[in-house]
């Protein structure tokens, strides 16, 4: 029997990394990048093409994006990561099939609409509801930017971009302006 090749530190470290990733639940259509982001994409049946669904901070968000895209493509017949979750709302009254951009937009909004907390973070609330409407195709970039900016905050259901980013919020409170003695105490 020939002698076995010497063990390489590169092989053992790559196997170690693969083992560490297994502590997270695996989801369909989701993989972890080497720098820690979770990415999602879906294959279109019978064509072999892929639709990029984005990169996310948590595997659950990437899995929800995949579920939304799967629902757009296969309807109720798909095998979902979260089968009991409410499905995304598709645009009403559309006679044309959904485009790649439509599917990406629906997936991004759906992934950001409910935040699932991993089982190892039990001190936080289980879900956070954020309104998710599918924007018109001309407002996709603006809507995506707002969704990304307010994704981690609790918002009232009637919040708008204007009320979230108002000029009044950038001014100091009136009690700070009147009580300046505390500044003199610092000096």
UniProtKB/Swiss-Prot annotation:
It comes from the Eukaryota. InterPro entries: AP2/ERF_dom (IPR001471), AP2/ERF_dom_sf (IPR036955), AP2/ERF_TF_ERF_subfamily (IPR051032), DNA-bd_dom_sf (IPR016177). The keyword DNA-binding applies. SUPFAM superfamilies: DNA-binding domain (SSF54171). GO terms for cellular component: nucleus. GO terms for molecular function: DNA-binding transcription factor activity; transcription cis-regulatory region binding. Signal peptide: none annotated. The keyword Heme does not apply. Pfam families: AP2 (PF00847). Keywords: Activator, DNA-binding, Nucleus, Transcription, Transcription regulation. Its main location: nucleus. Residues 26-83 bind DNA. It is found in: Nucleus. Probably acts as a transcriptional activator. Binds to the GCC-box pathogenesis-related promoter element. May be involved in the regulation of gene expression by stress factors and by components of stress signal transduction pathways. Belongs to the AP2/ERF transcription factor family. ERF subfamily. This is Ethylene-responsive transcription factor ERF015. It comes from Arabidopsis thaliana (Mouse-ear cress). The gene is ERF015.
């Amino acid at each position: 029997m020939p002698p076995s090749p010497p063990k390489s530190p590169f092989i053992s470290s790559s196997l170690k990394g693969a083992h560490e990733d297994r502590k997270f639940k695996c989801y369909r259509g989701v993989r972890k990048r080497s720098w820690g982001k979770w990415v999602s994409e879906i294959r279109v049946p019978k064509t072999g093409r892929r639709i990029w669904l984005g990169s996310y901070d948590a595997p659950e968000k990437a899995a929800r994006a995949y579920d939304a895209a799967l629902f757009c493509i296969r309807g109720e017949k798909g095998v979902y990561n979260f089968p009991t979750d409410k499905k995304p709302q598709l645009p009403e009254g559309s006679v044309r099939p959904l485009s790649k951009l439509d599917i990406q937009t629906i997936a991004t909004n759906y992934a950001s609409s409910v935040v699932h907390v991993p089982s190892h973070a039990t001190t936080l609330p289980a879900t956070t509801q954020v309104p998710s409407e599918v924007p018109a195709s001309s407002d996709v970039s603006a809507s995506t930017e707002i969704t990304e900016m307010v994704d981690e905050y609790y918002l009232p259901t009637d919040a708008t971009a204007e009320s979230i980013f108002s000029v009044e919020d950038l001014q100091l409170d009136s009690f700070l302006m009147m009580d300046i003695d505390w500044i003199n105490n610092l000096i």
